[in-house]
C-alpha cells in the first residue's frame, strides 16, 4: 500500500479550494483518503496555506511521498526542513 500526500480539489466551478490529504496512490484525485492534513486556497489574496505540521511529519516519516505540487507547499510551510532534521 503506497501512500501519497496530494491535493484534493474542492470548491465551486472556477473557484478551486484544495485539501492536502494522505491517500493511497491508486485512488482517484477526489476519492477516498486516509487523513486530511491541511488546506490550500490559491484564490485568496494573500494565498491561504494551513498545514498541520505534526500530522504531515508523522506521515512523511511513515513513508508517504508527496506529489510535486504538495512538496512545494510543504517546503513553503517549512515542513520539509523539519523532516530532513528528524531523519538525521
UniProtKB/Swiss-Prot annotation:
Q: Does the keyword Transcription apply?
A: no
InterPro entries (alphabetical):
Ribosomal_bS16, Ribosomal_bS16_dom_sf
Q: Which PANTHER family match?
A: 30S RIBOSOMAL PROTEIN S16, SMALL RIBOSOMAL SUBUNIT PROTEIN BS16M
From the UniProt record, which GO molecular function terms apply?
Answer: structural constituent of ribosome
Pfam entry (one): Ribosomal_S16
Entry keyword set? Ribonucleoprotein, Ribosomal protein
Family assignment from sequence similarity? Belongs to the bacterial ribosomal protein bS16 family.
Q: What is this protein called?
A: Small ribosomal subunit protein bS16
GO biological process assignments: translation
Q: Which SUPFAM superfamilies match?
A: Ribosomal protein S16
Q: Which domain of life is it from?
A: Bacteria
Organism lineage: Bacteria, Bacillati, Bacillota, Clostridia, Eubacteriales
State which gene encodes it.
rpsP
HAMAP family according to UniProt: Ribosomal_bS16
GO cellular component terms? cytoplasm; small ribosomal subunit
Amino acid at each position: 500500500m503506497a501512500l501519497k500526500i496530494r491535493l484534493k480539489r474542492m470548491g465551486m466551478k472556477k473557484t478551486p479550494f484544495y485539501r492536502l490529504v494522505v491517500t493511497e496512490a491508486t485512488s482517484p484525485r477526489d476519492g477516498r483518503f486516509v487523513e486530511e492534513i491541511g488546506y490550500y486556497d490559491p484564490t485568496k489574496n494573500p494565498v491561504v496555506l494551513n498545514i498541520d505540521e505534526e500530522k504531515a511529519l508523522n506521515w512523511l516519516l511513515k513513508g508517504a511521498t508527496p506529489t510535486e505540487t504538495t512538496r512545494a507547499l510543504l517546503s513553503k510551510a517549512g515542513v520539509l526542513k523539519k523532516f530532513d532534521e528528524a531523519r538525521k
